[in-house]
Structures are given as structure tokens and as C-alpha cells.
Regions:
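Charged, gly/pro-rich active-site loop segments
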Residues: 2-6, 78-137
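Hydrophobic alpha-helical segments typical of transmembrane helices
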Residues: 7-10, 22, 56, 97
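Short, surface-exposed beta-strand-loop junctions and turns on beta-sheet-rich folds
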Residues: 54-56, 75
Length: 137
């Protein structure tokens, strides 16, 4: 297992493959809240697409610290845990990004789960600590 703040090629692959990420945030009472979600990586920043007002978005507005766990869906012994903080929340291109994630995870061109009046928001996460466990050969 290695610990670093640099995203290695192996961790990049985990983030770019069709693996679900489990994103943990802190509730108002400091209890953990965890959500399985789609994930993206752009220029060293991890991006989570959510809807404005959802629990994880409210939580990171109050406390930007997050933990992310990803397990390779092809090999459960290839895994990464990332601690970081949300450095930006933006609605800019969030709908377009949801479509990009739908293409990656579902193979469809348009995000199919949007609700009427829903406002998509991107959570941009700066990785601070990365723990990667590689499978043994």
C-alpha cells in the first residue's frame, strides 16, 4: 500500500474506468454519510456530479472534507481511498457533465435520471491523501 498526494497512473485508471466511487461526507452532527456515485477526473481534480440541495452537497457546503473509496470492479484487491476537500462547487456545464457520466457508466448519450426543476452541480475535489493498494501477483 502506498500513501501520497500525487495521482499515479494506476489510480488515474481506477478513476477513469467504470468503477463506482463511495463518497463520504460529514453530517451536521459529525456522523458520516456515504453515497455511491459516478466519478470523473479532470486535470488532477476529482469531480462528482450531484443535484443542488442533496445531502452530500449540503454537507460539503458546511464542511468541505470528503473521503472517497473506489474498488476496481474487475479486481477487488485493486483499490484506492482518497481524502480530500471540495475546493469549488459550480453549476457551469453540470448538465453536460451529467451526460458525459451517463455515457461512461450507462452507455447512453443523455443523463436519464434528472428530475423536473433539478439543478445539477459539480463538486470539485482536491485530493490531499491517496492510499492505493495494488493487487499481488
Amino acid at each position: 500500500m502506498t500513501e501520497t498526494s500525487v495521482i499515479s497512473p494506476e489510480v488515474t485508471q481506477l478513476l477513469e474506468d467504470k468503477n463506482l466511487a463511495f463518497v463520504a461526507t460529514l453530517m451536521k452532527d459529525n456522523s458520516p454519510q456515504i453515497t455511491p456515485t459516478w466519478i470523473d477526473l479532470v486535470d488532477g481534480i476529482i469531480i462528482v456530479n450531484t443535484a443542488e440541495g442533496r445531502v452530500k452537497q449540503r454537507n460539503v457546503s458546511r464542511d468541505p472534507r470528503v473521503a472517497i473509496s473506489i474498488v476496481d470492479n474487475k479486481n477487488p484487491y485493486n483499490m484506492v481511498t482518497i481524502r480530500g476537500k471540495v475546493i469549488e462547487q459550480t453549476t457551469h456545464d453540470a448538465d453536460k457533465h451529467a451526460d458525459k457520466m451517463a455515457k461512461k457508466y450507462l452507455g447512453v448519450d443523455k443523463y436519464p435520471f434528472g428530475m423536473p426543476g433539478e439543478k445539477r452541480i459539480l463538486l470539485k475535489i482536491l485530493p490531499l491523501k491517496i492510499f492505493h493498494m495494488t493487487p499481488r501477483s
